């Protein structure tokens, strides 16, 4: 199963990058295998970048269905994540767009596109922040 997980960066002209293979991205996974490997390392404490654990809370709002048919749903929403690590509280916010495959017994994420609207990022971002 393919998945596309993309969080572009902002370029010098305040435009989002569009080509994750040739431009800087904040996070990019072109396959489900890469994303599953990252999640596995986080969940099994094999990620030195995630030690010590980050405590976080994510809220979503303004959920909107953009398109829907028998096997697919496209939706968008706003998110805010509060993250606490190294005695520092960070807040991340932005917009997500999902393409869900609804043809099977449970929905599967086929694409996740994240626009992070923070101007400054003080720590390394990871998939659990967005």
Regions inferred by a protein language model and the residue ranges of each:
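A beta-strand edge to alpha-helix "cap/lid" segment located at domain peripheries
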Residues: 64-130
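A solvent-exposed, acidic/Ser-Thr-rich amphipathic alpha-helical stretch
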Residues: 2-75
């Amino acid at each position: 199963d393919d998945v596309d997980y993309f969080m572009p960066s902002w370029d010098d002209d305040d435009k989002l990058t569009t080509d994750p293979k040739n431009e800087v991205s904040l996070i990019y996974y072109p396959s489900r295998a890469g994303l599953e490997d990252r999640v596995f390392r986080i969940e099994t404490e094999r990620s030195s970048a995630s030690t010590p654990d980050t405590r976080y809370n994510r809220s979503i709002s303004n959920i909107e269905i953009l398109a829907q048919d028998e096997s697919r749903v496209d939706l968008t929403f706003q998110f805010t994540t509060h993250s606490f690590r190294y005695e520092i509280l960070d807040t991340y916010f932005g917009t997500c767009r999902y393409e869900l495959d609804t043809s099977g017994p449970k929905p599967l994420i086929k694409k996740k596109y994240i626009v992070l609207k923070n101007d400054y990022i003080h720590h390394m971002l990871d998939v659990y922040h967005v």
